[in-house]
A protein has these predicted regions:
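Short beta-strands and strand-loop turn motifs
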Residues: 141-144, 168-174, 209-214, 325-327, ...
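Active-site pre-lysine segment of PLP-dependent enzymes
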Residues: 152-164, 177-246
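PLP-dependent aminotransferase class I/II
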Residues: 46, 236-317, 323-324
Length: 391
């Protein structure tokens, strides 16, 4: 693997004490035939999309001696246009913000609202990068726990808000690594509690921001609402999105934030100047010219997810049917009772199939690939489960 171990850092370097012994975050990047571990869209952009991107980048190359538009106004307008089309929610340019992937969006939110003495609250199990953002911004990371079916435990979450007084409440819909959707009634209850909640170390009248990470929202079932619909109703709501997943644009690193202007202005305080390159902006704008093509495989991936979930429920391990978490994403958390998921991971890898060991013990996650890749996954998993059964 290509990740560099922090344990190899020379002792004479003044690395922060809290970073000593830490490892760089990242899923394995291995050269194997079937990569189903990082929730990418497996289908490459269509030739027409590639041609437009290449042309726009060629045009912008003539101006690379100049800094880009640091407010990326044209791209923010493109975000507005896309969200109105995709979700039916009309927002203004000053309610959108872009960054280098939703990872940078989330980091900017932690920079703006976290910090020493501040607390951020998540709901376990959740995305494993959130505590990394907290660590890097000296924010204390606290957890409420989800229900056994991985749905949001609203009562436990509201009690945690009252007890720990967070500056940020981070929810994920669909949740990663489980795929569980967030019910709008549950979100409204959390937003309502946050509107009057105190923030530890802050002045009276300051209330927490609720961040909903919707990185995988385009994979939701038709008719499922999005948190974007509540932005006009709740001033304390911020919704993070990305072009990396359904939009098949992971390599370009483009994420964006939708919120009321006050939240956007807070994020603008901590952003680096000219953080989105001219090339990134040009490529993203070109991709939006081909929205239909970029999203053309989403319905098929949704069908693949549903078919794979049904198939997994028919499989057994040690005489027990596999558990499959409810999902509205492009990945599935499955297993529930694997005694040694690392063994299963290794055996699958030997057969050229790479998935993830994430989430609670006993569970594994697989993202949806092409039809050929999913056939390889099913064939390999059946063989591996048979081997494990014989142990």
């Amino acid at each position: 693997m290509s990740e560099t171990s922090s344990n190899a850092i020379p002792a004479y370097l003044p690395l922060r004490n809290d970073l000593i012994g830490e490892e760089p975050y990242g899923a394995p990047q291995l050269d194997v035939p079937v990569c189903l571990n990082v929730n990418e869209n497996p289908y490459a952009p269509e030739p027409a999309v590639v041609e437009t991107i290449a042309q726009r980048v060629k045009e912008i190359a003539l101006t690379l001696n100049r800094y880009p538009d640091r407010e990326h106004i044209a791209l923010r307008q493109a975000f507005c246009d896309y969200l109105e089309r995709e979700s039916g929610v009309k927002l203004e340019v000053d309610q959108l913000w872009g960054a280098n992937g939703s990872n940078e969006i989330m980091l900017q939110l932690f920079q703006a609202f976290g910090g020493p003495g501040r607390i951020a609250l998540g709901c376990d199990p959740t995305y494993s990068m959130y505590p990394e953002y907290a660590r890097d911004t000296f924010t204390t990371w606290k957890l409420a726990h989800r229900n056994e079916d991985f749905s949001l435990n609203v009562d436990a979450t509201i009690k945690a808000i009252e007890d720990v007084k967070p500056a940020m409440i981070v929810l994920t819909s669909p949740n990663n690594p489980t795929g569980t959707p967030l019910k709008m009634d549950d979100l409204k209850r959390v937003l309502g509690a946050a509107e009057t909640a105190e923030v530890a170390g802050a002045a009276e009248g300051v209330h927490p921001v609720v961040v909903v990470d919707e990185a995988y929202i385009e994979f939701r079932d038709p008719g499922t609402p999005t948190a974007l619909e509540l932005i006009g109703e709740y001033e304390n709501l911020a919704v993070s999105r990305t072009m990396s997943k359904a939009f098949a644009f992971a390599g370009a690193r483009v994420g964006y934030l939708a919120a009321n202007k006050g939240i956007i202005d807070c994020v603008r305080i901590v952003r680096m100047p000219y953080h989105l390159s001219a090339v990134t902006q040009a490529a993203a704008l070109a991709a939006f010219e081909h929205t239909d093509e970029q999203l053309s495989r989403v319905a098929h991936l949704r069908d693949t997810r549903n078919q794979t979930a049904a198939w997994l429920k028919e499989q057994t391990s040690k005489g027990q049917p596999l558990e499959v978490a409810e999902t509205q994403s492009n990945f599935i958390l499955f297993g529930g009772h694997f005694d040694d998921r690392d063994r299963i991971f290794d055996e699958l890898l030997k057969r050229g199939v790479l998935i993830r060991t994430v989430g609670p013990d006993g569970w594994m996650r697989v993202c949806m690939g092409t039809d050929e890749e999913m056939a390889r996954f099913r064939e390999a998993l059946v063989e591996v489960l048979r081997i494990v059964e014989q142990d």
